[in-house]
Amino acid sequence: MLLGGCLYGFAGGGLPPSIKTVAVLPFDNQTPEPTLTQEVSVAVREAVQSRLGLREASENQADAVVRGTISRYEPDLPVAYQGNTENNQVTVSRRLVQITVSVEILDQRRGKALWSRSGLLLEGDYSPGQERDGRQKALDKLVTNIVEGAQSQW
């Protein structure tokens, strides 16, 4: 028996037929971490293009816009500890990044929100010294939330 692979993607993924292009606006960043704006915008832009099948367009030309606010960034929350009985010391073995965002996808032609979430808490755990890994996990969760939310709402 020969088994074949199957590739699939979401070409529009449940979007209204009129939504073919999107502009991802830079997210407002209310945190002290300046690089978050670009990291979030790039991750969201790539996701709406590759996973929702939309083409990028300028804000004036786009059928829809994605906009949002990054309201909180906690990069160094200890979540797991390891004890050493020889010297009675406890060390942190896992840490957590938390990012809180609000996101909206707006149909520009109709002037109405297609999907929105406020206060979305995203987390990513990491080993000490590997904060970037935790941040990437949190960004991956943001992208998944936006894509799944958008597909389920339309």
Q: Where are these predicted regions, by residue range?
A:
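A structural "domain/chain start" motif
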Residues: 4-49, 53, 58-61, 106-109, ...
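Conserved acidic
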Residues: 32, 36, 40, 93, ...
